[in-house]
């Protein structure tokens, strides 16, 4: 029996080659597999089969000199681990769990000589990673993400403000003013606007700086912690580790317990914070990658199969789109 053959369709297949190529191109985009199937007028199963054709082999013979660690939520209540090349943004690995055993078992598959080539690891302030990074990468410096260091300070200031505010009468003008303009206390004082606007709470035209001065006049305790908070922000943003930690050590026993907790954490992680101030590396690139991962997951309404999710991440982030130029045909 003669069977017609064509270069358009692979032998013993029904889906044209061009459709398979389109599926591969669409998988690079941050859209769901159901949407891909709908756009190409094929079944979702066909898209999944094409996804399963992708295979990503780990290269255990090399690691980048600078890499970033972070975690992301795969399913509700379950965090997964991700490592990225800091320079070219390629994903090094995506692991289903973030426990020390899971991470250790993966990186021990690399020879010690390969692991010793890693010089910098950027990460969030997640203490279980610290010892693990030192064990696996003995030559690497740990650099904490600057955003999360400032976030710790900001949260301490916010909690102190709330505690002081709750000591006031809830019907009082002072309570309402602090609650209404709480963002001014959290904001960097150098970024406060000096434009006058009518403020209903005070029934007059005031700048943000004038409002802040009124808020601080309601409580000496609030004023003291605000001034300390702003000084710490100033030294941190100016990358002055000696002044930053000098201020912490001088005020450790005098501040609110909420600030004491943060200060003790900073002193314990002093070396890693100094690295963050002296080196220009951060976890910002990996945070941006995590936002793309969240977008992939959200567009797909979540993933039940971790391997499929992992493949979508590698396809979207490690396979670069080829740029094509449109050529106008002449009539």
Where are these regions (language model features)?
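Active-site beta-loop-alpha junctions of metal-dependent nucleic acid enzymes
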Residues: 12-14, 92-114, 120
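Non-catalytic alpha-helical coupling and interface elements of nucleotide-dependent molecular machines
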Residues: 28, 32, 41, 52, ...
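Short alpha-helix plus adjacent loop in nuclease-associated cores
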Residues: 149-170
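Secondary-structure boundary/capping signal
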Residues: 35, 44, 91, 140-141
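Short, positively charged, Gly/Tyr-enriched micro-motifs
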Residues: 1-67, 72-78, 115-118, 122, ...
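Gly-rich Lys/Arg/Thr-decorated short loops/hinges at beta-loop-alpha junctions or inter-strand turns
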Residues: 3-7, 84-90
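Acidic/histidine-rich catalytic cores and adjacent linkers
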Residues: 51, 76-77, 81, 87, ...
């Amino acid at each position: 029996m003669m069977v017609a053959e064509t270069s358009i369709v692979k032998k013993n297949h029904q889906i044209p080659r061009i459709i398979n190529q389109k599926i591969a191109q669409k998988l690079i985009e941050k859209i769901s597999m159901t949407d891909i199937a709908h756009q190409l007028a094929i079944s979702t199963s066909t898209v999944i089969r094409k996804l399963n054709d992708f295979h990503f082999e780990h290269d255990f013979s090399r690691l980048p000199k600078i890499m970033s660690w972070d975690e992301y939520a795969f399913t509700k209540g379950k965090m997964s681990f991700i490592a990225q090349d800091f320079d070219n943004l390629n994903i090094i690995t995506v692991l289903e769990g973030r426990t020390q055993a899971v991470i250790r078992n993966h990186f021990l598959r690399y020879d010690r000589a390969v692991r010793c080539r890693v010089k910098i690891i950027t990460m969030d302030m997640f203490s279980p990673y610290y010892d693990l990074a030192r064990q696996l990468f003995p030559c690497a410096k740990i650099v904490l993400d600057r955003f999360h260091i400032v976030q710790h300070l900001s949260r301490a200031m916010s909690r102190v403000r709330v505690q002081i505010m709750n000591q006031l009468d809830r019907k009082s003008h002072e309570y309402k003013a602090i609650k209404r303009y709480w963002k001014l206390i959290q904001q960097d004082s150098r970024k406060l606007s000096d434009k006058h606007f009518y403020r209903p709470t005070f029934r007059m035209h005031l700048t943000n700086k004038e409002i802040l001065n009124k808020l601080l006049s309601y409580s000496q305790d609030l004023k003291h912690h605000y001034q300390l908070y702003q000084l710490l922000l100033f030294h941190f943003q100016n990358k002055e580790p000696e002044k930053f930690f000098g201020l912490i050590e001088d005020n450790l026993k005098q501040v609110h317990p909420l600030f004491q907790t943060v200060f003790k954490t900073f002193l314990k992680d002093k070396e890693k914070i100094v690295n963050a101030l002296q080196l220009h590396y951060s976890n910002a690139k990996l945070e941006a990658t995590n936002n793309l991962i969240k977008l992939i997951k959200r567009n797909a309404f979540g993933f039940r199969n971790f391997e499929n999710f992992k493949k979508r991440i590698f396809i979207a982030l490690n396979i670069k789109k080829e740029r094509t130029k449109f050529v106008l045909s002449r009539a």
